């Protein structure tokens, strides 16, 4: 009997060890960020820096986009015809009708943080933190920069902040900017926000997913 109990104890211990060694489950849409620094300058320090070019970048201002990164996983992302964009937009739920815009990410609302004013066309967005949405209506997408706060966790009773695009209304829009659509010669499986064609005073904010790239130019203001 003692041998049976001892064997059972050993098996229980080994099972617990095996469970402890299993990696944690990965989220369906991992978190990610895109970052860029503008309006700074490269200087030569007294001692060479451990950077490309051995210089130091000083007085730069940060711009960052934080977002959930869904994977395509073989799906038709945007559809066609009358159904274009419907699959990407969140579905409705009791008390939460389907949003008219796309969260352009996954889970928590996509967030833009900027330490410097940004000009999109004729609109200047002050430094601060914003939510990003996209109106997928063709012939071009529209980037929406909104002052709607974001919920860290879904709270249906919190009407002062959004989870994804649920509850979005346009009254807090700070800017609406046309996005140029391009077809990529390859497929991007994981949704990616990026800063492209960058110069010291600005460039383009771009979103890539599948074979679609949507982008819009911006300028950083001193």
Regions found by a protein language model. Give the residues of each.
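Short amphipathic alpha-helical "recognition" segments used for binding
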Residues: 6-7, 60
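Bacterial N-terminal signal peptides
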Residues: 7-16
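Targeting-peptide/extracellular-domain and disordered-appendage signature
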Residues: 21-126, 131-222
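Positively charged n-region of N-terminal signal peptides that target proteins for export
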Residues: 1-4
